[in-house]
Design a protein with these regions (language model features):
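Extracytoplasmic "Venus flytrap"
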Residues: 54, 61-83, 117
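A local structural motif
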Residues: 58-62, 85-118, 130-133, 186, ...
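A structural signal for short loop-to-beta-strand junctions that line the ligand-binding cleft
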Residues: 62-63, 151-160, 165-166, 178-189, ...
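Short coil/turn segments
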Residues: 67-71, 161, 170-174, 188-196, ...
Length: 269
C-alpha cells in the first residue's frame, strides 16, 4: 500500500529552496483540452523525439526517485517507460527507453526507483542529496518544506490536484463514524514516522498525540488481525481497494476521511 505519506507529490529537482507555505489544492479536476495540437506541431515534436534529440541535452538514464512502492499514483511516470523495460527487483527499480506519447523514442533511458521501505523510509529530498545522479523525485508539499532548510528542492510538476492521503477504519467497529474527530478519544491512529501531516492534525486538536503510533510499515496483517479497530493511514486511491478486493481475509469496505477534507490542503504526488 502507499504510504503513504504515504501516503501522493510534486516532482522536484535539487536546486533552490522551496516556498515555506503550502500551495492551494484545487478541489476539482483540471479541465481537459477539447482540441488537438496542430498537425504540423505534432509532426515536429514527433520528428524531434524520433531523432533522439533529448540525448544531446539530458542525462541517460534520467533517474526518478519515487516516494513509495510502485503504485497507481506513480502511473504517469511509469507510462514513460518503453516496451523494453527491465525490472531490477533486488534494487527496487525499473529501467527502459524513455518514450513520449507512448511510442516516440526520445533517445535516452529512464530509471524509476521505489521509495519508502526501499530507501529505509527516508524522505525523498534526503535520498536525492545522497545521490546527485537522481534527476527528479516525488515529494509532498509538507515534506519539501520540512527539508527545505538543509535539503532545498524546487517543485516543477504536480501529479494529482487533491491529496489522496486518508485515515481509515472499519465502519463495523465504529458505527456511524464518518470523520476522524468522531472516533473515540482513545482510538489508536497508526501511521509511518514520515507522516508529517500528523503534527498539523495534533496541533488542530483533530487527534491527540497519545493516540499516534508511528509504526505503520504498509502491511495488512495488523489491520486484519484487529478487524480495523483503529485508525490507519492510507491513500483513497489504494488501500480501500486493497483491503476489500485483494485481501480476502478482510474482504470488506473501509471507512475513511481525506486529510484534505480535514483542512490539511497540500500537494502529495
Amino acid at each position: 500500500g502507499s504510504d503513504d505519506d504515504d501516503d501522493a507529490a510534486p516532482v522536484a529537482t535539487t536546486a533552490a529552496p522551496v516556498a515555506t507555505t503550502a500551495a492551494p489544492v484545487a478541489t476539482t479536476a483540471a479541465p481537459v483540452a477539447t482540441t488537438t495540437a496542430p498537425a504540423d506541431e505534432s509532426a515536429a515534436e514527433e520528428a524531434a523525439g524520433a531523432d533522439g534529440v533529448l540525448a544531446a541535452v539530458c542525462p541517460s538514464p534520467i533517474i526518478v526517485q519515487t516516494d513509495w512502492h510502485a503504485q497507481a499514483e506513480h502511473g504517469p511516470t511509469y507510462e514513460l517507460l518503453g516496451q523494453d523495460y527491465v525490472i531490477d527487483a533486488s534494487n527496487y527499480s525499473v529501467t527502459g527507453t524513455l518514450v513520449a506519447s507512448g511510442e516516440v523514442d526520445t533517445g535516452v533511458d529512464i530509471e524509476i526507483r521505489e521509495g519508502g521501505p526501499a530507501t529505509g523510509w527516508q524522505q525523498t529530498a534526503s535520498v536525492m542529496y545522497q545521490d546527485p545522479d537522481i534527476f527528479l523525485g516525488y515529494t509532498s508539499t509538507d515534506g519539501a518544506v520540512e527539508a527545505s532548510a538543509d535539503q532545498p528542492t524546487v517543485s516543477v510538476a504536480v501529479i494529482m490536484e487533491k491529496n489522496p492521503q486518508i485515515i481509515m477504519w472499519n465502519p463495523e467497529q465504529f458505527p456511524g463514524v464518518e470523520r476522524v474527530t468522531d472516533l473515540p478519544d482513545d482510538t489508536p491512529i497508526l501511521t509511518s514516522w514520515m507522516a508529517t501531516y500528523l503534527y498539523w492534525l495534533i496541533n488542530q486538536g483533530i487527534v491527540d498525540a497519545s493516540q499516534v503510533e508511528e509504526s505503520y510499515e504498509a502491511g495488512v496483517s495488523r489491520f486484519v488481525a484487529e478487524d480495523g479497530a483503529y485508525g490507519q493511514q492510507g491513500y483513497a486511491s489504494n488501500e480501500p481497494y486493497i483491503y476489500e478486493v485483494e485481501t480476502p481475509e478482510y474482504g470488506k469496505a473501509v471507512q475513511y476521511e481525506l486529510t484534505h477534507d480535514m483542512g490539511y490542503e497540500t500537494y502529495s504526488q
